[in-house]
Amino acid sequence: MRQHNLRILFFLLVLWGVAVACSRREARFRIGVSQCSEDEWRRQMNSEILREAHFYEDVEVDIRTAVDDNDRQAKDIRELIAEGVDLLIVAPNEATPITPVVEEAYNRGIPVIVVDRKILSDKYTAYVGADNYEIGKAVGEYVANVLHGQGDVVEISGLVGSTPAVDRHQGFVKAISAYPGIRLLAVEDGAWLQLKAGEKMDTLLSRFPHIDLVYAQNDRMAAGAYAAAAREGREKDMRFIGIDALSGKDYGVEKVLAGELDATFIYPTGGDRVMQIAMDILNKRDFPRETILGTSVVDRDNALIMKMQTAHIGTLDGKIETLNGKINQYLASYATQQVVLYGSLSALLLLVGLLVAVYLSLRAKNRLNRELSMQKKKLEEQKTQLIQQKELLE
């Protein structure tokens, strides 16, 4: 019975050791990220979120992408809610269809950070993004400057219904309205996509024999518009301006250096700032409800510097990823060593328990043997006395 109890104790100790070792690796917070689309700008933001997460302990980040599908994004958000995330980061595809599901999460007590695009409600915990209206105004002022207040302009907007598309257009129109010599000939919906923007540009080229400047609301659409104009041999007749200013092959900064774009405006991704605010919320620290990220123009004067700085940052990011990978390996090795250590301690405790049990058993056996010997001796003495009495009687 005593050995049976010791076996139970041993298994309980082993389970305790494993539980302690594993519990130190479990995430304390789980953050769900719902991205509306998957492009270079979104990938950059995701990379920044994940990189910043390395600097916090016990955080797990689950990123899902809706690929420009409102229904899919609503489904993604509801799945994250059902899985019990502690905080949601949402970049809405379109404001109207996504607002209800964001409100649903907020009403259930889940903190929600809305990024990049806004919703049609104030039921969110924090917002992080650029001021798209101000970016549109900055583009308008730049256009007025390079055209010297005179010229014919076409605009290729982002997805109709998305707040950045609306705000960038309104800001642009506000700026150029101060210059009567600038005419906005037409606005076409490029849906943020390069191929669709190219198709819309084909239409614009057929409609308007003279265009001085093409304003595309992101660099991918600007590249699509440039390619369409190049097919018609008209790319030298007009200027092209985009928004995003990402570095890398075929991105905005490279397009400026190649002479395809005259300029691109920085649209900061801000993934690191989003993650910092998320951790402030989860740890009950003060945080700003509205964080507006700044912008600036990238043209031929500063594009090379921008490219070099981004390349240097990319190198540092790679080193951080390598270091984080090694840290994870060390932590995994440490956790394994913990399990082995706790298992060894449990085995040692069992061994000590068994030794104690053996010792106590031997003591009990020796005591029993002594008692039996004494009883045997008494019986022998009684037997001898009986024999002697019998002999006397005879």
Can you annotate each of these PLM segments?
Residues 31, 35, 49, 138-180, ...:
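An alpha-beta-alpha
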Residues 32-48, 52, 56, 62-72, ...:
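Extracytoplasmic "Venus flytrap"
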Residues 41-55, 59, 135-139, 163-182, ...:
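Short, solvent-exposed amphipathic alpha-helices that sit
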Residues 73, 128-153, 196-198, 247-252, ...:
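Hydrophobic alpha-helical segments within soluble ligand-binding/sensing domains
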Residues 87-106, 172, 186, 190-250, ...:
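Hydrophobic alpha-helical
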Residues 95-134, 145, 152, 158, ...:
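Flexible loop/hinge segments that line or gate small-molecule binding clefts
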Residues 160, 164, 176, 271-346:
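Hinge/cleft segment of the Venus flytrap/periplasmic-binding protein
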Residues 327-386:
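Alpha-helical transmembrane signal-anchor helices
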